[in-house]
Amino acid sequence: MFQVPDSEGGRAGSRAMKPPGGESSNLFGSPEEATPSSRPNRMASNIFGPTEEPQNIPKRTNPPGGKGSGIFDESTPVQTRQHLNPPGGKTSDIFGSPVTATSRLAHPNKPKDHVFLCEGEEPKSDLKAARSIPAGAEPGEKGSARKAGPAKEQEPMPTVDSHEPRLGPRPRSHNKVLNPPGGKSSISFY
């Protein structure tokens, strides 16, 4: 039962004489005394004694039905996987055979300026032969290059009407600033 300790002089003062729920907080009206709960009193503590925790209450360190975070487990060193590039560079061989990678360009988004060649070809001799022969002549016709006209006409310079919109704004032939950063002024510079 709730009791108030006596104060000096035997008067209670403004202290409550009964608990907030009245003498009995039993709402269902059973005359039996309330059985003490199996849980230990939370306010009672024993620093030197073992803590008594009920075995049937789940721990709240892990989410229900989920995987534990592993924070409170024994500390085991986490092994990180290291992805090292092979000495020859990265390869696209998914089967793991040791194929050396071709020489990489400076940037992967730049277009490749080389052509993959078969194993038996010699690229240097073909390139030298192609450069030494004029564009309008074939390898067998050395003297007829002057007689035949150029095989390819030069493309005309792009005009304003043939401009493609994906290449940016149309080229302008004047120096007039249409939208200056400070706003338009009444003075026109031609």
From Swiss-Prot:
Organism taxonomic ancestry: Eukaryota, Metazoa, Chordata, Craniata, Vertebrata
Role description: Nicotinic acid adenine dinucleotide phosphate (NAADP) binding protein required for NAADP-evoked intracellular calcium release. Confers NAADP-sensitivity to the two pore channels (TPCs) complex. Enables NAADP to activate Ca(2+) release from the endoplasmic reticulum through ryanodine receptors.
Gene responsible for this protein: JPT2
Origin superkingdom: Eukaryota
Single GO cellular component term: cytoplasm
Any Gene Ontology biological process: regulation of calcium-mediated signaling
N-acetylmethionine found at: 1
Modified residues (Phosphoserine): 30, 45, 69, 97, 132, 144
Region spans: Disordered: 1-190
Localization in the cell: Cytoplasm; Nucleus
Protein name per the record: Jupiter microtubule associated homolog 2
Assembly description: Monomer. Dimer. Interacts with TPCN1.
